[in-house]
């Protein structure tokens, strides 16, 4: 009888160990978005993050969750390996005095950090800290500019995982230019805008051991319908989470329904 109980305990322990090992391998990614603050189909933070979360979840061992604003419950941050800001001025969200201690702890732990479009921005009080965290800083009130153009999205480093699985293409986008960058930040994507070449995306390997990725596109919701557009962003987010990106790029399958936007409650009936 004792041997039977011992054998059962060993089997149970084996399966519990398997479950624990599986949980440990899950890479949790948190996408921070917000409610609309632009015209319909522009800066659709929540809908665009939902698309990215669906795509991220197609990579084995990865789970992604969207939060409207910084999570109020600290438990939501437990086990998170990478954070993505697709929101108004991500730097001011991350370094808000109410969450700054959390942010600094996460950065010291080497968490992956990504920012998309206006998420690359920060107001002046958070600017320098954001620059040191992301490697780049957008602020149209102080030094940056933006304009809508159709131009070729170019790969500055085709061998980088962010460039896996897609080819250069023409993209109509609201491009940000004249950002501040750390010398160590490395351009990954670029575009020629009004006859001058500018970075469109960059990577930065932080001294704390974490990886950061900035992508300046993302103004127009329609662009998330482009496979190559989604793949570059998803590849970049996975890279910050230290997930191996396959040579053909990350899977980014979506449906036409995924691109549908909810009604705009701001619109008068």
Where are these regions (language model features)?
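Bacterial N-terminal signal peptides
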Residues: 5-17
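Extracellular ligand-binding/catalytic regions of CAZymes and related secreted enzymes
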Residues: 22-27, 33, 51, 58, ...
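Structural recognition of the beta-strand scaffold that forms the well-ordered cores
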Residues: 28-33, 64-66, 81-87, 107, ...
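A glycine-rich, often tryptophan-bearing local segment used as a flexible ligand/cofactor-contacting loop or short
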Residues: 32, 90-164
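Solvent-exposed loop/turn segments at secondary-structure junctions
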Residues: 35-39, 70-72, 88-93, 113, ...
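Glycine- and acidic-residue-enriched helix-capping/strand-helix junction motifs
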Residues: 36-50
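Catalytic beta-strand/loop cores that center a nucleophilic Ser/Cys/Thr
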Residues: 57, 65, 136, 140, ...
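A short, well-structured beta->alpha microelement
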Residues: 60-73
